[in-house]
């Protein structure tokens, strides 16, 4: 069956890359795994051979029949039809102990919805997903992998880097060239491994931190203090910067997660009375 462009389908055919993905998941026989977008089942076959329960969510109705015919007799296989962003898959398997509460996610996800899928799997700073997955092994566009795994000071480091790394550690597993797919995509790809933190870094007001990140990264070319002046007075900003060893000329992409948390704590909630209109 040919890949469908409207679903962002590119079949991963490299045996070596498939093996790397499975190895990165560090599967145990007792594991229950969620696979998003099983496609034609190349990765599915490997996962079924390694774990006690596999829940696969597929949107393409034509593929559903093929997958059911190929794997439907396997007792450790549960196939759900629907959009992973809209389907309440947790409710669909809640009364099936063999599949309920998967601890790991393995997926070759459509690149055009990577952000929403990450949010559905990790949650947000203000509302982390609970219970958290133990490990997520995802095949994503290289540009996205660079942003997710970037460290302070790197060009790719931004609000997405902070939001994801607040919730999980991120590391690259391997690069995946276009020739590894059929049809080949026009972009480079990377396998990444996310390990959600059992309890994210302590922040006394996660909602405020979300707002602070939005404002801080609103204009990356500007100094951070200028981006924050619409929320806080110059005196508040200078005091918080000094307390967390942040240079006056620092830009948002140079701050560590701990420094962002420190700013969030020290600056408090922005109020009209705190704004210095002449700053």
From Swiss-Prot:
Subcellular location: Cytoplasm
Listed EC numbers: 2.1.1.182
SMART domains named among the record's database cross-references: rADc
CDD domains named among the record's database cross-references: AdoMet_MTases
MF GO annotations: 16S rRNA (adenine(1518)-N(6)/adenine(1519)-N(6))-dimethyltransferase activity; RNA binding
Gene3D superfamilies assigned: Ribosomal RNA adenine dimethylase-like, domain 2, Vaccinia Virus protein VP39
Binding residue positions for S-adenosyl-L-methionine: 10, 12, 37, 58, 83, 108
Pfam families: RrnaAD
Organism domain of life: Bacteria
Reactions listed under catalytic activity: adenosine(1518)/adenosine(1519) in 16S rRNA + 4 S-adenosyl-L-methionine = N(6)-dimethyladenosine(1518)/N(6)-dimethyladenosine(1519) in 16S rRNA + 4 S-adenosyl-L-homocysteine + 4 H(+)
GO cellular component annotations of the record: cytosol
Keywords: Cytoplasm, Methyltransferase, RNA-binding, rRNA processing, S-adenosyl-L-methionine, Transferase
Main subcellular location: cytoplasm
InterPro entries (alphabetical): KsgA/Erm, rRNA_Ade_diMease-like_C, rRNA_Ade_Mease_Trfase_CS, rRNA_Ade_methylase_Trfase_N, rRNA_adenine_dimethylase, SAM-dependent_MTases_sf
Entry similarity comment: Belongs to the class I-like SAM-binding methyltransferase superfamily. rRNA adenine N(6)-methyltransferase family. RsmA subfamily.
Role of this protein: Specifically dimethylates two adjacent adenosines (A1518 and A1519) in the loop of a conserved hairpin near the 3'-end of 16S rRNA in the 30S particle. May play a critical role in biogenesis of 30S subunits.
HAMAP family named in the record: 16SrRNA_methyltr_A (MF_00607)
Name the record gives this protein: Ribosomal RNA small subunit methyltransferase A
Species per Swiss-Prot/TrEMBL record: Synechococcus elongatus (strain ATCC 33912 / PCC 7942 / FACHB-805) (Anacystis nidulans R2)
């Amino acid at each position: 069956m040919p890949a469908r462009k409207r679903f962002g389908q590119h079949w991963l055919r490299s045996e070596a890359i498939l093996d790397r993905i499975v190895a990165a998941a560090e599967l145990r026989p007792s594991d229950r795994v969620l696979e998003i977008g099983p496609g034609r089942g190349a990765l599915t076959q490997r996962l079924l051979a390694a774990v006690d329960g596999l829940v696969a969510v597929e949107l393409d109705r034509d593929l559903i029949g093929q997958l059911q015919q190929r794997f439907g007799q396997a007792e450790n296989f549960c196939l759900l039809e629907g959009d992973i962003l809209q389907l309440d898959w947790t409710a669909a398997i809640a009364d099936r102990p063999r599949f309920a509460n998967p601890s790991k996610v393995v997926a070759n996800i459509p690149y055009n919805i990577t952000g929403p899928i990450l949010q559905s799997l990790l949650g947000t700073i203000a509302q982390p997903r609970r219970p958290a997955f133990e490990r997520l092994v995802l095949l994503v566009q290289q540009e996205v992998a660079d942003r997710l795994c970037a460290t302070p000071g790197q060009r790719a480091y931004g609000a997405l880097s902070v939001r994801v790394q607040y919730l999980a550690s991120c590391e690259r597993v391997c690069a995946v060239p276009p020739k590894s797919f059929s049809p080949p995509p026009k972009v480079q790809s990377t396998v990444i491994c996310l390990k959600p933190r059992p309890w994210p870094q302590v922040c006394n007001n996660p909602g405020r931190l979300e707002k602070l990140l939005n404002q801080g990264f609103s204009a990356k070319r500007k100094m951070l203090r200028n981006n924050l002046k619409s929320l806080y007075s110059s005196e508040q900003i200078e005091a918080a910067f000094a307390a967390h060893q942040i240079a006056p000329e620092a830009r948002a992409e140079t701050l560590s997660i701990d420094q962002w948390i420190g700013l969030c704590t020290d600056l408090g909630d922005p109020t009209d009375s705190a704004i210095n209109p002449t700053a």
